[in-house]
Amino acid sequence: MAKLVIIRGNSGSGKSSLAKKMQTHYGRGTLLIAQDTVRRDMLKEKVEPGNLSIDLTESLACFGYEHDLLVLVEGFYETDIYCHMLERLRTLFGPQTLAYYYDLTFEETVSRHQTRAKQEEFTPADMKRWWKDRDFLGWQEESFFRDEDSLEAAFERIVQDLEKI
């Protein structure tokens, strides 16, 4: 049965590292849909309402659903732009949906970003400009990672949650 895991949060919070760790752990049968790859690399789209990455992300997730894959949707996915698409995916996958949000302080995201290999790609000033505080979906099943949650703790939590659905 297909399962959907949505991992959201501000730039530099650890979403990509977590999603890649999940994909490595589960291996074949896992579809990782990274917002940066779809929006920026594949389509060269801007972050704006109606951008083509919304439909492509949904289509890829539907492919995963049709093929009974574990679908990992990872990215910033600002609610004012992406909430309708995420709601449709939630409806499609039903109770096989898990959603997580990195609810970190700005200072923690900067600290995490400074440990990354790609830290030169954008600055703390860029991060501040893009920052959206507590951009929650408002779903009952949405869970949160806080400053004190390590990559390993977040990973273990999702693995345990997946075993329950």
Language-model-detected regions and their locations in the chain:
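Hydrophobic anchor at the beta1->P-loop junction of P-loop NTPases
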Residues: 7
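P-loop (Walker A) phosphate-binding loop of NTP-binding proteins
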Residues: 10
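ATP-binding Walker
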Residues: 13
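Walker A/P-loop
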Residues: 16
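Conserved substrate/cofactor phosphate-moiety recognition/catalytic segment
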Residues: 20-66
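Glycine-rich phosphate-binding loop used to anchor ATP phosphates in small-molecule kinases
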Residues: 52-94
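Conserved phosphate-donor/acceptor-positioning beta-strand/loop module used by diverse small-molecule
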Residues: 93-112
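Small-molecule kinase domains that catalyze NTP-dependent phosphoryl transfer to phosphate-bearing small molecules
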Residues: 115-159, 165
